């Protein structure tokens, strides 16, 4: 039997910044247990007044708590004078955005 501390993280967030833009890559499950991690990881880029590209191309699961985190982050980035844009997404992310009528709320990169 393995302990919880040895289990791989349910969510991984990597932030890189260059040329006035932050790229945030999210992998794993974005849900009630991990949504706070995303918000915490984006606290600094959100206040930088830059474009924040959110790559959700490795998100395997997202629920309403994950969606709420995306909305909170988007508002924080906007309040900081920047803009949040979605890069890659998965069918799970696209489906949730479509079902909730929020597909147009998040501008897309390119």
Ranges and model annotations:
Residues 1-61, 72-110:
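STAS-like cytosolic regulatory interaction modules
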